[in-house]
A protein has these predicted regions:
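Charged alpha-helical signal-transmission linkers that cap and connect PAS-family sensory domains
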Residues: 99-102, 116-120
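PAS/LOV and related PAS-like sensory modules
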Residues: 1-22, 124-145
């Protein structure tokens, strides 16, 4: 129940969100992620993350994965992403690990900011979203414990 509410918060996010498994296959994403990349969600799920990165950025994405495997998170990693139409955009990637009850890594929740959209208006929208999301997640946590 609580995971469903937390997941809904991510699915409704104005930022790109995806969940991957431990080998980099996309298990879920929000509509913002799909729309920014120009795909239907069904075309994204089950694909490797490298399909949304131009070849010249594979090394940067691979370094990001390596950092994630070693530390369980990635913070402020600049990566170039590729849309379905072949155009690219600079993104800022943040990832945190997901673990099972035995502390085995299952995958990650990843948030990506399109740096070409970082206007004052967008930053205000993001701040509002994250403030509200933090409050909702706090309420969920209080009910859970």
């Amino acid at each position: 129940m609580h995971q469903t509410k937390a997941r809904k918060t991510l699915k409704d996010a104005p930022v790109m969100w995806r969940r991957i498994n431990s080998i980099g296959i996309i298990l879920d994403c929000n509509s913002t992620y799909a729309a920014n990349l120009g795909y239907a969600k069904s075309e994204i799920l089950g694909k490797p993350i490298f399909e949304h990165v131009p070849k010249e950025s594979w090394e940067a994405m691979n370094d990001s994965l390596k950092t994630w495997f070693e530390t369980g998170e990635v913070t402020d990693r600049k990566i170039t992403f590729k849309r379905q139409d072949g155009s690219t955009f600079p993104g800022l990637l943040q990832a945190t690990s997901l673990y099972d009850e035995n502390k085995n890594m299952l995958g990650s929740n990843t948030v990506i900011f399109d740096l070409t959209q970082m206007t004052d208006e967008k930053i205000t929208e993001y701040k509002k979203f994250f403030s509200e999301a933090n409050n909702r997640l706090g309420e969920i946590k209080e009910k859970e414990y």
